[in-house]
Amino acid sequence: MFLKALASALVALSVAACGPAGRTELIPVEGDASMGPADAKVTLVEYGSPTCPGCKAWHDNYWEELKRDYITPGKIKFVFREFAIHGAIDAGIFAVARCAGKDEFYAVIDEAFLRQDALVQASLKGDAISELNALGDKFRISADQVKSCINDRAIIRRINDVRSDAQGKGINSTPTFVLN
């Protein structure tokens, strides 16, 4: 039942998010953070942001079930593409996730969803670095490392490239899902 509902919702979201051609081509991007088998017949890509309320609602209501029933058993490959819809705070979260490494990437994103209110409020007050440091600290990333991560040109370039690529495909909001 869940799969039918998810598939219907994803198709609707994917079509709604597509450009004029009505189709978004799913191309692997170097450095994609993925879960599940690399050679899975089904790939689900989420363009998401840990500061997006809609992304948080999806994450809170469906993420664990999707992992348990489809990703962990190897039925699908899931890719989270960092879409910095809210600018610097999202980019900072993504930088911390990238610096945590492949094995901790999704754990950092999960934690950022849990801390969404604090991260957004700190950003609005101009003190995002304090919350980014707290996020990093949870994953043994020092304040100096967080600073280095958020200034890492390769990470910044990837975040900008994902956003540009997404917008080139007509994807302008989060969460947007693309299913092959």
List the predicted regions and their residue ranges:
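Cysteine-centric redox/oxidoreductase cores and disulfide-bonded domains
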Residues: I85-T174, V178-N180
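Extracytoplasmic thiol/disulfide redox context detector
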Residues: F2-H86, N160-R163, Q167
